[in-house]
UniProtKB/Swiss-Prot annotation:
Organism of this sequence: Streptococcus pyogenes serotype M12 (strain MGAS2096)
Organismal lineage: Bacteria, Bacillati, Bacillota, Bacilli, Lactobacillales
Binding site for Mn(2+) 2: D298, H303, H351
Annotated residues for binding of Mn(2+) 1: D13, D339, H340
SUPFAM superfamilies: Alkaline phosphatase-like (SSF53649), DeoB insert domain-like (SSF143856)
Protein name, as recorded: Phosphopentomutase
Molecular functions per Gene Ontology: magnesium ion binding; manganese ion binding; phosphopentomutase activity
Cofactor: Mn(2+)
């Protein structure tokens, strides 16, 4: 019999809690990640008040320097720790795949200076369309169509760009390049980015509509991902008949592998929390696992190095935690964590190699305290033990510490 009938894992994308031991091997604009500290630096520079996470014990997590504006709790309502990554990458897919039990020894490729001519030329030859070279770099998805959408409408060129993650994205106006044509181009791009030196996690079709100054991305987005290289705990759960619910980009990250119910993409963190709450309320969801990603921290504020915006985004999530609690059952377990860091005060614009926090809460807890410090995959090992399935490659369960 399961200790918890339902477990809900919420990933606060990029909310790291201090430099990892191997941060000296990871860089931002030539600066090693050794002094990165997403939560710590936001707390120091912008002020951070997250009373609901603080009550669970966020301020009690072991750190060289305590979080400046987050108090410790003498009698927290949950259990906390921080977890270290073993995989050789600090991107979204690597973090999530490791959380679900995999050790990624060959990280995906990222292209901070844009894609090489060889790839661009192949796409041009296949599609019969030119690529706007000036867009070929890490770019905000909305900014890139604002900057190059008018030109595309005139010329029919492709907007090819990337991000901090191992992705190639192609944006096209639906009236200029039909969606089906865009999909065919993306399928081809997928076929040429399956091995080094261009091993990419996802190819994303990004259709948009509108007029210059008022472009809008449409729901016809399509992701061409790669599945995890072996079964994760999601697969073990699904194979055992345990329902799995994906909220946000989780389904894309795992290419649908091990996901039995995809609840759709998030328009924003707030929309993602709404979807999570709707998932919690589903009458048929009496047992199983939900997995939510909230990406605004990372996409809107981490990469843009905006500590005040990041702070406000954390406040927004914390303010809505009581709603999540109110929709949980007595025997539910909530796990709040991250997938990497993205210190908005740091050099460069890339992710940062950090520990991630872990907060565990259940109305059924009679105890509280610290969970032994471990690794990302301990989360999936705990989920696996709870539901009586095997772990994946790595991970040590902390289920026995939750009283």
């Amino acid at each position: 019999m399961s200790k918890f009938n339902r477990i809900h894992l919420v990933v606060l994308d990029s909310v790291g809690i201090g430099a990892a031991p191997d941060a000296d091997k990871f860089f931002n604009a030539g600066v090693a990640d050794t002094d990165s500290d997403t939560l710590g630096h936001i707390s120091e520079t912008a002020g951070l008040s997250v009373p609901n996470m603080a009550k669970i014990g966020l301020g009690n997590i072991s750190r060289p320097i305590p979080l400046k504006t987050i108090p410790t709790e003498d009698n927290p309502t949950g259990y906390v720790t921080k977890l270290e990554e073993v995989s050789l990458g600090k991107d979204t897919m690597t973090g999530h795949w490791e959380i679900m039990g995999l050790n990624i020894t060959e990280p995906f490729d990222t292209f901070w200076n844009g894609f090489p001519e060889e790839i661009l030329t192949k796409i041009e030859e296949f599609s019969g369309r030119k690529i706007i070279r000036e867009a070929n770099k890490p770019y905000s998805g909305t900014a890139v169509i604002d900057d190059f959408g008018p030109r595309q409408m005139e010329t029919g060129e492709l907007i090819v760009y990337t991000s901090a993650d191992p992705v190639l994205q192609i944006a096209a106006h639906e009236d200029i390049i039909p969606v089906e044509e865009l999909y065919k181009i993306c399928e081809y791009a997928r076929s040429i980015t399956l091995e080094r030196p261009a091993l990419l996690g996802r190819i994303i079709a990004r259709p948009y509509v509108g007029e210059p100054g008022n472009f809008t991305r449409t729901a016809n987005r399509h992701d061409y991902a790669v599945s995890p290289f072996q079964d994760t705990v999601l697969n073990k759960l699904a194979d055992a008949g345990v329902p799995t619910y994906a909220v946000g980009k989780i389904n894309d990250i795992f290419n649908g592998s091990g996901i039995t119910n995809d609840m759709g993409h998030n328009k924003s963190n707030s929309h993602g929390i709404d979807t999570l709450i709707k998932t919690l309320q589903l009458p048929e969801f009496t047992k199983g696992f939900s997995f939510t990603n909230l990406v605004d921290f990372d996409a809107n504020f981490g990469h843009r190095r905006d500590p005040e915006g990041y702070r406000d985004c954390l406040h927004e999530f914390d303010n809505r935690l009581p709603e999540i609690f109110a929709n949980m059952k007595e025997d539910d377990l909530l796990l709040i964590t991250a997938d990497h860091g993205n210190d908005p005060t740091y050099a460069g614009t890339d992710h940062t190699r950090e520990y991630i926090p872990l907060l565990a809460y259940s109305a059924s807890f009679t105890g509280n305290g610290l969970i032994p410090q471990g690794h990302f995959a301990d989360i999936s090992a705990t989920v696996a033990e709870n539901f009586g399935v095997d772990t994946a490659m790595i991970g040590e369960s902390f289920l026995g510490h939750l009283k």
